[in-house]
C-alpha cells in the first residue's frame, strides 16, 4: 500500500510539472524589458480566455501594489484563426503565475523586429521583373498573365505605404497601425515593397488591391507583439471582406526566432492568406529567424542579377525559393522611386507571383508548392542545404 501511495504522489508531481507552461527562448539583446507574449493552448474557449485575462489583471494589480511596479499589465489580445494569445508588460511574479495556469501553452519575451533591407544604389537598373518572367537571364521585358492579381487583396505588413503614390492609384486603402499614431510611411520601405508586389510600373501583380498595415516605425523597428497584432487585423479584415482564399500577405521583416510569430503566420496561412516572408540578411541559416523559420509560409532568399546568392542573404533548408533582391528599383514616398537591396525586396516578388496565381485559381494551400514546382534551378552557390531554385511566374518565356 505504501508503494502505491509513493507512485500516486510521483504521478501527481509529474502531472503538475507537465501542466506548467513552457517559457520559449529566454534572454537576448533584442528583448523588450518586461514585455511578454502569452499563447494559450488549443481548444481554450472565449470564456476561458476572458476568465484568464481577468485573473491575470487581478494578479498583476496585487503584485504591482506590493512591489511598486510600473508595468502596465495586459495590452492586446489576439485571435488568429482560433489561435488565442495576448501581450503585456508584467513583473516576474505575475509571469510565474501565468506559467502555472493550465490553460497557457507557452510564454516568450516580446522582441524587437526590424526591416530586412540593406543598401541604396542610385540609378541602378530595373531587372527583377524581367528575370522572374524568363527562364534565362538578361531579358528586360516583363511577361505576365493579363489577370495580374485582379480580385486578390495583398496586405503589406511593413512601415506603412504612401497610399497617394501614383503606382497604387485606385487600388489601395489604409488598414491599421500597431506601432504609432502616424499613418504615413516615414521610412519608405513599405512603399518600396508594395511597389514590387503590386505597383503599376514596378509590380508583379499589377491589378491586385493593396492594404497598408503599419507595424514598423519610421526608424524601421517594431515588436513581435506589434507584428502579431497586424497579422491578426489582416485575417479579421480578409474574413470580413470575403477575401480569404484570394488574399496574400507580405512580411519583409524579421527578428530572432519566435514561436509566437511563427504560429501567427501559420494560422494566417491556414485561414486562407498566402504568406510570403523575407529570409533575413545575416548570411546565416534562416532557421534561427522569425517569421522566416515558419514551415507553412513561403520564405524568400535574395538573388543577384547574375543568378548568384546575394552576399547578405540568409539560407538553409527552410528557404523555399530565391527571388531578385539586389539593387531593386521600386516606388518611394512622395511619388518617386528608390533602389534597395535585401531579402525584403525578394519577398514581394514572391508575394506578387503568389497573388497572380491566386487570381488564376491556384489555392492558397498550393501556391508555394506551385511556385517551387515551376521555378528554375539556376542559383549558383545557394548555401548549405538550400534550394537553388529561382522564382519564375510561368510565362512560358
Curated annotation (Swiss-Prot):
Q: Which GO terms describe its cellular component?
A: extracellular region
User: Pro-region residues?
Assistant: 20-116
**Residues in the active site?**
158, 189, 344
Q: Does the keyword Lipoprotein apply?
A: no
List glycan-bearing residues.
250, 393
A Pfam family this protein belongs to?
A: Inhibitor_I9
Gene name of the encoded protein: SUB3
Organism, as annotated: Arthroderma otae (strain ATCC MYA-4605 / CBS 113480)
Q: Where are the transmembrane segments?
A: none
The protein's UniProt keywords, in alphabetical order, are: Glycoprotein, Hydrolase, Protease, Secreted, Serine protease, Signal, Virulence, Zymogen
Q: Which superkingdom? A: Eukaryota
According to the record, the signal peptide region is: 1-19
What's the protein here called? Subtilisin-like protease 3
Reported function:
Secreted subtilisin-like serine protease with keratinolytic activity that contributes to pathogenicity.
Q: Which family does it belong to?
A: Belongs to the peptidase S8 family.
The beginning of the lineage is:
Eukaryota, Fungi, Dikarya, Ascomycota, Pezizomycotina
Q: What is its EC number?
A: 3.4.21.-
Q: Per its UniProt record, what PROSITE patterns does this chain match? A: SUBTILASE (PS51892), SUBTILASE_SER (PS00138)
BP-aspect Gene Ontology terms:
proteolysis
CDD domains in the cross-refs: Peptidases_S8_PCSK9_ProteinaseK_like (cd04077)
**Peptidase S8 domain ranges (all copies):** 126-397
Output the InterPro entries linked to this UniProt entry: PCSK9_ProteinaseK-like, Peptidase_S8/S53_dom, Peptidase_S8/S53_dom_sf, Peptidase_S8_Ser-AS, Peptidase_S8_subtilisin-like, Peptidase_S8_subtilisin-rel, S8pro/Inhibitor_I9, S8pro/Inhibitor_I9_sf
Cell compartment(s), UniProt: Secreted
Amino acid at each position: 500500500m505504501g508503494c502505491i501511495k509513493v507512485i500516486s504522489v510521483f504521478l501527481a508531481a509529474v502531472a503538475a510539472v507537465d501542466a506548467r507552461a513552457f517559457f520559449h527562448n529566454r534572454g537576448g539583446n533584442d528583448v523588450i524589458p518586461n514585455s511578454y507574449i502569452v499563447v494559450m493552448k488549443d481548444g481554450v474557449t472565449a470564456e476561458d480566455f476572458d476568465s484568464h485575462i481577468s485573473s491575470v489583471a487581478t494578479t498583476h494589480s496585487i503584485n504591482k501594489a506590493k512591489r511598486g511596479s510600473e508595468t502596465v499589465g495586459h495590452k492586446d489580445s489576439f485571435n488568429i484563426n482560433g489561435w488565442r494569445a495576448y501581450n503585456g508588460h508584467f513583473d516576474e511574479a505575475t509571469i510565474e503565475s501565468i506559467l502555472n495556469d493550465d490553460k497557457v501553452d507557452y510564454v516568450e519575451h516580446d522582441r524587437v523586429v526590424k526591416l530586412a533591407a540593406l543598401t541604396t544604389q542610385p540609378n541602378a537598373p530595373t531587372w527583377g521583373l524581367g528575370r522572374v518572367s524568363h527562364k534565362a537571364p538578361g531579358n528586360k521585358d516583363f511577361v505576365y498573365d493579363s489577370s495580374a492579381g485582379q480580385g486578390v487583396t495583398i496586405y503589406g505588413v511593413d512601415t506603412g505605404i504612401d497610399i497617394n503614390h501614383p503606382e497604387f492609384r485606385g487600388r489601395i486603402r489604409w488598414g491599421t497601425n500597431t506601432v504609432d499614431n502616424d499613418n504615413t510611411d516615414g521610412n519608405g520601405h513599405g512603399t518600396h515593397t508594395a511597389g514590387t508586389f503590386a505597383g503599376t510600373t514596378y509590380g508583379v501583380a499589377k491589378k491586385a488591391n493593396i492594404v497598408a498595415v503599419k507595424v514598423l516605425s519610421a526608424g524601421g523597428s517594431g515588436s513581435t507583439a506589434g507584428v502579431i497584432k497586424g497579422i491578426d487585423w489582416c485575417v479579421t479584415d480578409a474574413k470580413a471582406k470575403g477575401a480569404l482564399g484570394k488574399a496574400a500577405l507580405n512580411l519583409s521583416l524579421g527578428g530572432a526566432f519566435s514561436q509566437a510569430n511563427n504560429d501567427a503566420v501559420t494560422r494566417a496561412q491556414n485561414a486562407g492568406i498566402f504568406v510570403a516572408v523575407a529570409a533575413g540578411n545575416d548570411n546565416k541559416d534562416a532557421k534561427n529567424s522569425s517569421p522566416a523559420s515558419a514551415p507553412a509560409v513561403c520564405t524568400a532568399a535574395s538573388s543577384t542579377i547574375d543568378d548568384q546568392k546575394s552576399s547578405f542573404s540568409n539560407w538553409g533548408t527552410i528557404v523555399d525559393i530565391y527571388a531578385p533582391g539586389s539593387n531593386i528599383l521600386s516606388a518611394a514616398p512622395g511619388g518617386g522611386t528608390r533602389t534597395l537591396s535585401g531579402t525584403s525586396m525578394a519577398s514581394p516578388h514572391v508575394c506578387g507571383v503568389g497573388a497572380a496565381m491566386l487570381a488564376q485559381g491556384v489555392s492558397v494551400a498550393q501556391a508555394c508548392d506551385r511556385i517551387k514546382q515551376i521555378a528554375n534551378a539556376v542559383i549558383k552557390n545557394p548555401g548549405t542545404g538550400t534550394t537553388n531554385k529561382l522564382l519564375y511566374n510561368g510565362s512560358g518565356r
